[in-house]
Curated annotation (Swiss-Prot):
Described purpose of this protein according to its UniProt entry: Required for a complete transcriptional response to osmotic stress.
Compositionally biased region (Polar residues): 475-486
An MF annotation (GO) of this entry: RNA polymerase II cis-regulatory region sequence-specific DNA binding
Keyword flag Glycoprotein: no
Species in which this protein is naturally found: Eremothecium gossypii (strain ATCC 10895 / CBS 109.51 / FGSC 9923 / NRRL Y-1056)
Name of the protein: High-osmolarity-induced transcription protein 1
Biased composition (Basic and acidic residues): 487-501
Keyword Transcription on entry: yes
Record-linked PANTHER family: HIGH-OSMOLARITY-INDUCED TRANSCRIPTION PROTEIN 1 (PTHR37784:SF2), PROTEIN MSN1 (PTHR37784)
Length: 629
């Protein structure tokens, strides 16, 4: 039955009577075995100690009390108490219920009994004597206490389960939050990568290997233009400076012999310089000299400047007053005494200088007899050979060293007709360039006729100087250099009386290269062929190294004849193809093979159209792109 106050299950009257009878029987058995009252008292005290130990174990699992011994002593004490003092047992149970009244106890006695008996039976299976004692006694009080502790443990487990459930809920919430943050971070990363790719596409790539070839081509093109421009400026500047120098030498007095401190010398210089300085030609040269400093390259006007430079200077137009002044100056110079050691050689030198002045007519009264060339000059009006052969009045006469042959072609152009430099022999001396200047001139029918005529043409030329004048110059003891416009040939006379009129060059003919007289250099039997409209770089290179159709190669012609084999034809073709020759030779000189250099040129021809098609540019375009090499 259940106590209404403590809710503790207590045994009924029948169970108490049954317990007392069992207790009496047990006590009788103990007396028979000689246990006596002392043994019963010991069991009662052991029962109390066992109950406290069970409570201590249930409340404090870490206690070191032996649960097995406590259960054994409790069961023994309960059996003795139920048989001898039922009221005390009942009171003890009531007290025990009051002691643990704060612990919630299950309302189901059946369930409690089941849990309690199950726990008791599992803890004491190995001791047969203890099981016999429990089965013989009344375990109601023990079951009640065990059920209370089990209920308490169950309540604690429920609290722990709720706490664990809350913890798991928090963990799930955190995992969901982490997953959401991860998804947001992935979306943010994707957007950032997309923006970075867009920025990367907008930024120009400087180290793109596809653009290196284009950059190299543009650089080569700019370098070629710069080289062509600089070479052209040097040629034009040197030509203009040479022309101005020759005109200034006309007015210079450094080459004139010393005339002493006579009054006639000052009058002579004034009378000689003033008439020419007042002319229009002298002023035009001064203006041209100033303009030369501000020269600007105009490639389209190359041929125009050539034509202008090829024109001879205009003949000086003198008035009648100027002629009278010059005539008086000549008469005053004739009357200058030439005796004395200082001026012993003055007469012939001055007469040689005046040989290039205007042919001034003089009256018979003004003429004086003179054994020098001046008399020949005065009488030249009646000499048809000298009259027809006199030079331009704007000529430059230099008395002194006559070794001016190297200045003959200072202004000669080394350019071909397209305006690009053709340095056939590279860096050569000035004399070598003079001999090969024919290669840089425009060949016409007249020039070719002059070349075929040979040196004998000078002897048949009616404009050649008479032999008497030449001998007088040779015997005068002076060394005279006569020069004219850049296109006329200079006459150099030295102290040698073995000059012959057949060896004198014509005054108004252009300089020409005299070839050797051996049959090899006359190029009469040379047969060669150049490829017409080549379609590949390999064909041009084979033409240079091997030859076409068994004919001599270009390299062989260059090594054997120099530039003489192409003076009359194929000049432009060779000048254009020479750029390809030089490009390949420079690569071979730097350690590359001929095939590699040819492949480089072929790859330069390849380009891509708007329709993304690969095509090749022409050989002419390739040659033009290599200008300046």
């Amino acid at each position: 039955m259940i106590d209404p106050v403590t809710h503790i299950v207590t045994p009924s009257n029948d169970e108490q009577r049954q317990g007392r009878s069992d207790g009496g029987m047990q006590l009788g058995l103990e007396d028979l075995h000689g246990g006596g009252g002392g043994l019963g008292q010991q069991k009662v005290s052991g029962m109390a100690e066992g109950t406290d130990s069970i409570v201590d174990v249930l409340t404090n699992p870490s206690s070191s009390v032996n649960l097995h011994s406590n259960i054994l002593s409790v069961s023994t004490n309960v059996e003795e108490g139920q048989g001898m003092q039922p009221a005390a047992i009942q009171g003890g149970g009531t007290a025990a219920g009051r002691r643990f009244s704060s612990v919630p106890i299950s309302d189901s006695p059946v369930g409690c009994g089941q849990h309690g008996m199950g726990t008791a039976s599992t803890q004491v299976p190995s001791h047969g004597s203890t099981a016999n004692l429990l089965s013989m006694g009344n375990p109601v009080a023990t079951n009640v206490q065990v059920c209370q502790r089990m209920d308490e443990v169950s309540a604690r487990l429920i609290v722990m389960e709720e706490t664990v459930n809350k913890l798991l809920g928090n963990i799930d919430a955190q995992q969901q939050q982490i997953a959401s943050m991860r998804s947001e971070s992935m979306e943010m990363l994707g957007s950032l990568m997309k923006e970075v790719r867009e920025l990367k596409q907008q930024v120009p790539v400087l180290d793109d290997p596809d653009n290196n070839e284009k950059d190299k081509f543009v650089t080569d093109l700019l370098n070629s233009i710069t080289n062509v421009s600089s070479n052209y400026l040097k040629k034009v500047s040197s030509r203009n400076l040479q022309r101005f120098k020759r005109q200034r030498d006309i007015m210079s007095t450094s080459d004139l012999p010393s005339l002493g401190n006579t009054q006639s010398s000052s009058h002579f210089m004034q009378d000689l310089v003033n008439p020419y300085a007042s002319t229009q030609d002298f002023q035009s040269f001064t203006v041209l000299k100033d303009k030369a400093k501000e020269f600007t390259l105009n490639p389209t006007a190359i041929n125009k400047r050539r034509r202008l430079s090829a024109q001879p200077l205009n003949t000086l137009q003198m008035s009648q007053d100027q002629l009278q002044q010059q005539r008086g100056s000549v008469q005053s110079l004739i009357s200058i005494p030439t005796s004395g050691q200082k001026n012993a050689n003055f007469g012939p030198q001055l007469q040689n200088y005046l040989i290039g002045l205007q042919n001034i007519p003089m009256s018979e009264a003004e003429k004086v007899s003179s054994p020098t060339v001046l008399k020949q000059f005065q009488n030249s009006t009646t000499d048809p050979d000298l009259k027809t052969g006199r030079r331009n009045p704007g000529l430059d006469f230099q008395i002194g060293s006559g070794d001016d042959e190297n200045d003959e072609n200072d202004g000669a152009s080394g350019e071909d007709e397209d305006g690009y430099l053709e340095d056939d022999e590279g860096y050569r001396s000035q004399s070598q360039r003079t001999m090969s200047s024919e290669d840089d001139e425009q060949f016409t029918g007249g020039n070719q006729g002059e070349d075929e005529a040979g040196p004998r043409a000078a002897g048949r030329n009616p404009k050649s100087l008479p032999s008497s004048i030449v001998r007088r110059f040779a015997n005068s003891g002076s060394q005279v250099s006569v020069s004219g416009t850049p296109e006329t040939e200079r006459l150099v006379l030295k102290n040698n009386d073995k000059y012959d009129k057949n060896t004198m060059p014509a005054p108004n003919t252009k300089p020409r290269a005299v070839l050797a007289s051996n049959p090899e250099d006359t190029l009469t039997d040379v047969q060669y062929t150049m490829v017409k409209a080549p379609d590949s770089v390999r064909a041009i290179w084979d033409e240079y190294t091997i030859g076409v159709g068994g004919k001599p190669s270009i390299r062989q012609l260059e090594q054997t004849y120099g530039n003489k084999w192409r003076t009359k034809r194929n000049k432009k073709t060779f000048a254009r193809r020479k750029r390809i020759y030089k490009f390949i030779l420079n690569g071979v000189r730097n350690g590359k093979s001929e095939s590699e250099m040819i492949d480089i040129l072929e790859s330069r021809r390849v380009y891509r159209t708007e329709d993304n098609e690969l095509k090749k540019r022409t050989i002419g375009w390739l040659q033009q792109s290599l200008s300046g090499i």
